[in-house]
Swiss-Prot record:
Keywords: Chaperone, Cytoplasm, Protein transport, Translocation, Transport. One of its GO terms (cellular component) is cytoplasm. It comes from Pasteurella multocida (strain Pm70). This is Protein-export protein SecB. NCBIfam families: PRK05751.1-4 (NF004393), secB (TIGR00809). GO terms for biological process: protein folding; protein tetramerization; protein transport. Homotetramer, a dimer of dimers. One homotetramer interacts with 1 SecA dimer. GO terms for molecular function: unfolded protein binding. One of the proteins required for the normal export of preproteins out of the cell cytoplasm. It is a molecular chaperone that binds to a subset of precursor proteins, maintaining them in a translocation-competent state. It also specifically binds to its receptor SecA. InterPro entries: SecB, SecB-like_sf. SUPFAM superfamilies: SecB-like (SSF54611). The gene is secB. Belongs to the SecB family. Its main location: cytoplasm. It is found in: Cytoplasm.
Length: 170
């Protein structure tokens, strides 16, 4: 009987262990536009780069989550303001995630999973820009942990502001 209890205790501990597994990584959407070709190549290459990044996450099954990393890069010419190119990539993945508390789950979905997706998205952006025969564009690494901490601080400040406004009303 004691052996059976030990086995059940071991099974319980095993099921409570945090799990994060990649099931699939894929391109959900991609767009590359170079509206001013070929005359843009006749200008001096003095680009002004605009970079936007966001993430989305949704549950798609039991312990299955889709995380999408959205990257948008727009390059315009400093001198003329002409758009050289616009590159938009939605790199996504399905992850098995379990055994996490609420804050750990939020960190996993907004930091750890996007961190796994970023190299794929960065390579795709680089490849698309290269196929447009523009100079190489290598996106710098992103610190998703710092972005998550910044998000938490903004949320905390917003909650404090709301509490202060509610105190002023009463």
């Amino acid at each position: 009987m004691s052996e059976e209890n030990q086995v059940n205790a071991a099974d319980t501990q095993a099921t409570q262990q945090p799990v994060l597994q990649i099931q699939r990584i894929y391109v959900k959407d991609v767009s590359f536009e170079a509206p001013n070709l070929p005359h843009i190549f006749q200008q001096d290459w003095e680009p002004k780069l605009s970079f936007d990044l966001s993430t989305e996450a949704k549950q798609v099954g039991d312990d299955l989550y889709e995380v999408c990393l959205n990257i948008s890069v727009e390059t315009t010419m400093e001198s003329s303001g002409d758009v050289a190119f616009i590159c938009e990539v939605k790199q996504a993945g399905v992850f098995t995630i379990s055994g996490l508390e609420e804050m750990q789950m939020a960190h996993c979905l907004t930091s750890q999973c996007p961190n796994m997706l970023f190299p794929y998205a960065r390579e795709l952006v680089s490849s698309l820009v290269n196929r447009g025969t523009f100079p190489a564009l290598n996106l710098s690494p992103v610190n998703f942990d710092a972005l998550f901490m910044d998000y938490l601080q903004r949320q905390e400040q917003a909650e404090q502001t709301t509490e202060e406004e509610n105190k002023d009303v009463h």
